[in-house]
Amino acid sequence: RSFFYPLRFFFCEGPQCALPLVALNYHNVEIRIHWATAASNYNVECFANYYYLDNEERGQVASRKHDLLITQVQKNIASGTLVQELTFNHPVKYLASSDTTTDGALTSPTNKVKLNINGLDVSNYKWGKPHFIDVTSYYHTNFVTSPDFFLYCFCLSTSSLQPTGTLNFSRVSSATIMSESMNINDPIYAVNYNILRVEN
């Protein structure tokens, strides 16, 4: 029996996002994966796709500076209270959290949540489901496989490689998600943009 799990790093999103390994010829590129103990029962292999260049193209890629637009994932540990401080940096395209049980504060159909930026409410309290699950998935994603996936978007499209909107958390004094009646017990993730510069 065999399984296929695509790794969703920024350089896996398409040919235009590939790492210019020719320009990194004096550096190692490593992928470190920490598996749970149950993974020791499996034989795991990792495969990569390469784009081959002729000698002239290789010289051009190796000699010039590359500024790559990349995405990163940041994580906030759950506060266990009604207020969750968001201590993120960089331009964030969306916030996400997931809870497959019925008692997740952000994904519950019986709890309301709101976002507060610099002491100002972005909106009134809204039901976690449908406002931050069904509605945001419909308008801002191509597909979401989890039925209980909290999503707060600052972008028009979560799957677009180019920015379609962000909130720059580096310029924000304070940001919080507030729950009306249930403690926030799930971590919150932020997907942000950054620039990776490669130069010789």
Give, region by region, the residue ranges found by the protein language model.
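Flexible assembly/topogenesis modules
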Residues: 1-200
